[in-house]
Regions:
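Structural microenvironment flanking redox-active thiols in thiol-disulfide oxidoreductases
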Residues: 1-37, 48
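Short, internal strand/loop/helix patches
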Residues: 32-61, 65-67
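Thiol-/selenol-based redox modules, centered on thioredoxin-like
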Residues: 68-149, 178
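Short coil turns that delineate tetratricopeptide repeat
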Residues: 131, 163-165
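Alpha-helical linker/edge segments of TPR/alpha-solenoid repeat scaffolds
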Residues: 177-205, 218
Length: 218
C-alpha cells in the first residue's frame, strides 16, 4: 500500500483515482489493520465475498485494471507492482509499469499503452462453465467457513481450485483459513514451486505499445 500511496500523491491532481480492494474472507479482522497502518488517502475497500475477483476474473495479487473516465477498461487484469520490495521473488522491475501508468494518466486515450479493442478481446478472460462453477464452489466454502463449518468448507475450496487452477487467489485464501498442510496436503510455497516458480506465479505485464506513437490521432 505505501507504493500505491506514493503513486497517488504524484498523480492525483491529474484526474487520476485509485480504488484498492482487499480480497479477504475475514474482512476487516484480517485486512483492516493493514489499511489502518498504511493511512491511504485513496479509496481502500474490503471485499469479503471476492466479488471483484469474480467479476474481473482476477487470479492473483497485486492485480491492476485501468478504467477510463467513461468506465471503459483500457487495460485488463495484469500484475501491478508499484515498488520493488518483492523484486527478488517476482523478478519484476516496477519501473516499466509505473512509466506506462504515468503515460496513460498524462495522455489519456492517446497513450501508447491503451489497448485497442481487438487486443483487449484477445487478453480478456471469458468466463466458462468451470470458472463459473469454481466461483460458486468457493462462495459455498466461504459460507460454510463463516458459519463455523470449516471441515465441510474444505472440499468446496478444493473444488474451486480444481475447476479454476489458474486462481492463486483461491489457493491463498483457502490455505490462510486453516492448516494448509493438514487440510490440503500442500502449502502455498509448494504450489508456487510446483507451477514453475515466480515466473509462472507472476507473469510480467504486456507493456508492448499498442501502436507506433505517430499513429495515434492528434
Amino acid at each position: 500500500m505505501p507504493g500505491w500511496q506514493a503513486i497517488y500523491q504524484r498523480l492525483k491532481d491529474k484526474n487520476f483515482e485509485i480504488v484498492s480492494v482487499a480480497q479477504d474472507t475475514n474482512g476487516v479482522k484480517d485486512a483492516g489493520p493493514w489499511i489502518t497502518a498504511a493511512h491511504p488517502t485513496y479509496t481502500a475497500l474490503i471485499d469479503e465475498k471476492h466479488l471483484v475477483s469474480k467479476l474481473y476474473n482476477m487470479v492473483n495479487v497485486p492485480t491492476g485494471v485501468w478504467i477510463d473516465e467513461q468506465g471503459r477498461i483500457v487495460r485488463p487484469n495484469e500484475v501491478a507492482f508499484v515498488d520493488d520490495r518483492f523484486k527478488d521473488f517476482s523478478g519484476l522491475d516496477s519501473a516499466p509499469y509505473l512509466n506506462a501508468l504515468a503515460d496513460w494518466v498524462e495522455k489519456g486515450d492517446k497513450s501508447i499503452y491503451v489497448m485497442s479493442e481487438e487486443r483487449l478481446r484477445e487478453r480478456l478472460t471469458v468466463n466458462n462453465s468451470d470458472i463459473a462453477l469454481a466461483a460458486a464452489e468457493f462462495g459455498l466454502g466461504e459460507y460454510l467457513y463463516k458459519s463455523g463449518h470449516l471441515t465441510e468448507a474444505v472440499p468446496h475450496f478444493k473444488s474451486a481450485q480444481r475447476l479454476n487452477p489458474k486462481s492463486w487467489n483461491y489457493k491463498r485464501q483457502a490455505y490462510a483459513l486453516s492448516d494448509a498442510k493438514s487440510d490440503y496436503g500442500t502449502t502455498f510455497i509448494d504450489e508456487v514451486e510446483k507451477a514453475g516458480g515466480s515466473k509462472a506465479y507472476y507473469p510480467p505485464p504486456d507493456l508492448m505499445p499498442s501502436v507506433n506513437p505517430q499513429d495515434k490521432r492528434p
